[in-house]
Amino acid sequence: MARIFSIQSNLPSFQRQTRIRLGIGSLGRNLDGCRIGFDLGGSDRKAAAVIDGEVKYSEEIVWDPYFEQNPDYHYEGIMDTLKRAAEHLPRVDAIGGSAAGCYSHNRVTWASLFRGVGPKDFDEKVRGMFLKIAEE
């Protein structure tokens, strides 16, 4: 748990927890604006650019991130995907993505895409990668 949340945690047993009530409702549904969606997989990267919900661009690019030790390979691949999609939009209002792993506050805490990256490079270059991308 410490690796995921960056703190030690102690979880009480489920029996001692307050009853959980699940609500059913719609999330999102906001299609307005110029948006990019991406998915980072183990064998390809996918991206789509939409304007007001209408797809203007969609692409799938082969890549092999799993055992790549250099975090720049991952960063450059992700940026390439986003830039390709952005070329089809007059502006970018929002970006949403998906990738297997654990992410907290847009930081990578653990993800199989980066399994080849050593601990030092992971902490220095991977953990805050999506925050760096958001700034650019």
Give the residues covered by each predicted segment.
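Short beta-strand segments
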Residues: D39, G96-S98
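Glycine-rich phosphate-binding loop and adjoining helix at the ATP-binding site
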Residues: M1, V62-M79, A94, G101-E136
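Non-catalytic propeptide/linker segments at domain boundaries
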Residues: M1-G33
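Active-site-proximal loop/short-helix segments
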Residues: D52-E54, A99-S104
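Residue-level detector of high-confidence beta-strand sites
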Residues: S58-E60
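Gly/Thr-rich phosphate-binding beta-strand-loop-beta motif of the actin/hexokinase/Hsp70
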Residues: R21-K56
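Short amphipathic alpha-helices and their capping/turn segments at secondary-structure boundaries
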Residues: C34-G37, Y75-V92
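Short, flexible, glycine/charge-rich loop motifs used to bind or transfer phosphoryl groups or to couple energy/partner
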Residues: S26, A85, K132-I133
